[in-house]
Each structure stands twice: as C-alpha cells, then as structure tokens.
Curated annotation (Swiss-Prot):
Its main location: mitochondrion. This is NADH-ubiquinone oxidoreductase chain 1. Belongs to the complex I subunit 1 family. It comes from Polypterus ornatipinnis (Ornate bichir). It catalyses: a ubiquinone + NADH + 5 H(+)(in) = a ubiquinol + NAD(+) + 4 H(+)(out).
Length: 319
C-alpha cells in the first residue's frame, strides 16, 4: 500500500461522516423551526442549505480564547480526543462492509465509547470554572450510569444472535428484525442512547438555565466546534448502531446501503422530535430511571433469555 492510499482510505471514510453530521445540524434546526411554527435557517444558500458550512467556517476562523487560569495543554487536548474517539467508533460498523472487520466489534465499541468520559471530565477540570466542572461531573455520572444498561441490553442481544461481531446481527435478522421479539430492549436502548449522547430530555449537562452551557462553557471557536462535531457524530453513530442491532439489513442486496441510511435518518429525526416535544428531566428522575427501572428490568430480561433455552433444552420440537 502506498502512502497516498493510507491517507485517502481514512479520508474517504471520515469526510462523508462529517458531511452527514453537518447537515444533521441543519435538519435539526429546520425541524425544530417548523415544530415551533417558524422557518429555521433560510438565508445562507438556497433554503439555508449552506448554513452548516457557514457555521463551521465562522467557528474555525474565530480566535480560540483560553481562560488565563486554565490548564493549557489539557484544555486543547480534550476536544481533539472527543472528536477522534467519535470517528474511531465508525471503523467497525458494517455499512454493509466495515473498514476493519473485528472479531469483538461490540466489545470494541463499548470500550472506545466509555473513553469519551475522559474527554468530558478533562474539559470540565481543565477549564478551571465551577460551572464547567459541575457540568462535567453530571455528564460523567450520566454517561457511566447509562452505559451499564447499554451493556446489559447488548448482552441480551448477543444471546439472540450468538456472536460479538455486528455482521452476525445482519445474518440473524434475515427472518425477522430484533425490534419485534425484543421490543422492551429496543425501547430501553433508544432512551439510553438519548441519555448517552446528552440529548434532550437528558441534556442536564448543558442546562442553560443552571450551568450556562455545561462542560464546554469556556470553549470558543475551533475547540468548541470540535466538541460540537463530536456530539453530532456520536448521535449519528448511536442511530447507525441501533439500526444494525434492531432493524436488520435490507432483503434486497442492491439497496442495502440506501436502506441502512434511510433507517438511520428516521431514528435521527426521532432524536430531534423528542427534543422538540419533551422538557428536561430533573437530575434525580434521570438517575432513578436508570438505576431503579432500567437496571432491574434488563437484568430480569437477561435471566429470562438465559433460562428459557436451558429450560426448553431436550423438549421435542413440536412443543
């Protein structure tokens, strides 16, 4: 492999993701606009289509202001880490072919997504601001809590499919989508992904009325744009993963890419719809939901999915 190939391959993967993420921000602003009986962005370019590009250019040409009391290295390192991790997570996704087909894809995704906690905590601490630190601590507690349920839901799904690779999910769902037999898991998964990506109604980390802007309050210009890119890249990733886990592939192999993309965009628009419809949770309600409702239910379902095949083993097939 030549040096050019080594550079072009990742770029061919990264640029479409970043473009999709940029236009997701436009879709969000348009959708929220129409839900609030207004137009949304419509000045920059035809129908406001160039708005994300204008926003990106505007942010990156602004001066990156650093607080005088902040930790300079960590302050600039954490946004870079956030975006890097968000893009690394796309590598093993079968769309329908992965850039790198790993044997333990799901374990890799769980491991890398849990590392994003460090970028949030680091940014809150390095800012040397009480609002940023409180926002970061909230974000970390929320992310770690909901990762527990995401992990348990995935364990249940692995029992259905019989493998840790995402390609086995495609094979297992040829007959029926997993959203039908495992709809309680799908509902909990969707709500947990909302919380994991810090989206409304779980956007307690950036509660403007309490914390100004959360852990990224001291960031401006380029570093702020990197956090913004990471957040929306993670939203798209979670919806792409939800599509692979619960909504299966297309039966028509010619349109498998288009089919996957349409399902992902429908789920992403549901994320935006939820933001327009629901008020923010109180912090204790957020924690009660995961530790007192989701955790017992997911553990019960895991027990059920383990015990059912064992108890039915040896019984004649007609039963």
């Amino acid at each position: 492999m030549t040096l050019i190939t080594l550079i072009i391959n990742p770029l061919m993967y990264i640029i479409p993701i970043l473009l999709a993420m940029a236009f997701l921000t436009l879709v969000e602003r348009k959708m929220l606009g129409y839900m609030q009986l207004r137009k949304g962005p419509n000045i920059v370019g035809p129908y406001g289509l160039l708005q994300p590009i204008a926003d990106g250019v505007k942010l990156f040409i602004k001066e990156p202001v650093k607080p005088s009391t902040s930790s300079p290295t960590l302050f600039l390192l954490t946004p870079t880490l956030a975006l890097t991790l968000a893009l690394i997570l796309w590598i093993p996704l079968p769309m329908p072919l992965a850039l790198t087909d790993l044997n333990l894809t799901i374990l890799f995704i769980l491991a890398v997504s849990s590392l994003s906690v460090y970028s949030i905590l680091g940014s809150g601490w390095a800012s040397n601001s009480k609002y940023a630190l409180i926002g970061a601590l909230r974000a970390v507690a929320q992310t770690i809590s909901y990762e527990v349920t995401l992990g348990l839901i995935i364990i249940s799904l692995i029992m259905f499919t019989g493998g840790f690779t995402l390609t086995t999910f495609n094979t297992a769902q040829e007959a029926v989508w997993l959203i039908l037999p495992a709809w309680p898991l799908a509902a909990m998964w969707f709500i947990s992904t909302l919380a994991e990506t810090n989206r409304a109604p779980f956007d307690l980390t950036e509660g403007e009325s309490e914390l100004v802007s959360g852990f990224n309050v001291e960031y401006a210009g380029g570093p702020f744009a990197l956090f913004f890119l990471a957040e929306y890249t993670n939203i798209l990733l979670m919806n792409a993963l939800s599509t692979i886990l619960f909504l299966g592939p297309s039966f028509n192999t010619l349109t498998i890419n288009l089919n996957w993309a349409i399902k992902t965009m429908i789920l992403a628009s549901m994320f935006l719809w939820v933001r327009a419809s629901y008020p923010r949770f109180r912090y204790d309600q957020l924690m009660h939901l995961v530790w007192k409702n989701f955790l017992p239910l997911t553990l019960a379902l895991i027990t059920w999915h383990i015990s059912l095949p064992i108890s039915m083993a040896g019984s004649p097939p007609q039963l």
